[in-house]
Curated annotation (Swiss-Prot):
This is ATP synthase subunit delta. PROSITE patterns: ATPASE_DELTA. F-type ATPases have 2 components, F(1) - the catalytic core - and F(0) - the membrane proton channel. F(1) has five subunits: alpha(3), beta(3), gamma(1), delta(1), epsilon(1). F(0) has three main subunits: a(1), b(2) and c(10-14). The alpha and beta chains form an alternating ring which encloses part of the gamma chain. F(1) is attached to F(0) by a central stalk formed by the gamma and epsilon chains, while a peripheral stalk is formed by the delta and b chains. It is a peripheral membrane protein. It comes from the Bacteria. It is found in: Cell membrane. It comes from Rhodococcus jostii (strain RHA1). InterPro entries: ATP_synth_OSCP/delta_N_sf, ATPase_OSCP/d_CS, ATPase_OSCP/dsu. Pfam families: OSCP.
Length: 275
């Protein structure tokens, strides 16, 4: 994302904060959830209507004119708070049209995560999205159904919604179903991992992805979390995936850093040293 779009995103986020600040404290959580859901709906419409999205992102047209068009099209169809965020976004000069749409999605996600945080559900949302990624990655048939470009986005969302209904938080379901209908070049599991990481980022936590040769006990998990928290100097979320092929031990990945303490890793290192 170029400088112009980065500044436009900053202004759009500021508009979200302002919109949420304009409602009463008791209504802020519901407003955040509504803004997120409605921004997703707006993007879905813009994805389908090339002429409209081009008009709303045309930098040769004055920003106030683009804002007026947004109000003409979406006024009365979304809340006043959502419309304020949308008008702020289209009034900015974005480097490319895709930056506008992707940023509306991002701000929508952040708004939904704000609602989850207000309800004390942010940790649950993060964990649910991570586990969903692992489930999909381990189910080739489901992964194919969700990633098949010949399947309409609406049908993919309906499929995932049926699978998730009543099993995860409303925010996790909303985030996941939106993402699966707009995968572009991402695999479904990767998209869900990205959402999980975004949830962790909302509470300034580091995500540690751990592969273990066997399930960790609660005590082992707590000890690992405490060790990583001391190492990185900030809260750490530990996501554990069991992988018997490791033979023993753990592989811990934090960002681009990998700590391989597995039996398979030690064997590989030994083989390399003997060459």
């Amino acid at each position: 994302m170029y400088a112009a779009s980065r500044e436009a995103l900053t202004q759009t986020r500021a508009a979200l904060s302002s919109a949420l600040g304009s409602v009463s404290a008791g209504a802020a959580t519901a407003a955040a959830a509504q803004i997120g859901a409605e921004l997703f709906s707006v993007v879905e419409i813009l994805d389908e209507q090339r002429t409209l999205r081009s008009a709303l992102s045309d930098t040769s047209t004055p920003g106030n004119v683009r804002e007026g068009l947004a109000e003409q099209v979406f006024g009365g169809k979304v809340s006043a708070e959502t419309l304020a965020v949308l008008k702020a976004a289209v009034g900015q000069d974005w480097s490319v049209t895709s930056d506008l749409l992707n940023s509306l999605v991002l701000v929508g996600r952040e708004s939904l995560l704000k609602a989850a945080a207000d309800q004390g559900q942010l940790d649950a949302v993060e964990d649910e999205l991570f586990r969903l990624g692992r489930i999909v990655a381990g189910n080739p048939k489901l992964e194919q159904s969700l990633s098949d470009r010949s399947v309409p986005a609406k049908r993919k969302r309906e499929l995932l919604s049926k699978l998730l209904y009543g099993k995860v938080t409303a925010v996790a379901e909303a985030l996941a179903t939106q993402a699966v209908g707009r995968l572009k070049n991402s695999a479904p599991a990767d998209a869900f991992d990205e959402l999980s990481n975004l949830a962790a980022a909302q509470r300034e936590a580091v995500v540690a992805k751990v592969r273990s040769s066997a399930p960790l006990s609660s005590e082992q998990s707590d000890r690992l979390t405490a060790t990583l928290t001391r190492t990185y100097g900030k809260p750490v979320t530990v996501h554990v995936e069991v992988d018997p092929e490791l033979l023993s031990g753990l592989v811990v990945r934090v960002g681009d850093e990998v700590i391989d303490g597995s039996g398979a890793g030690r064997l590989a290192a030994l083989r390399k040293s003997l060459k």
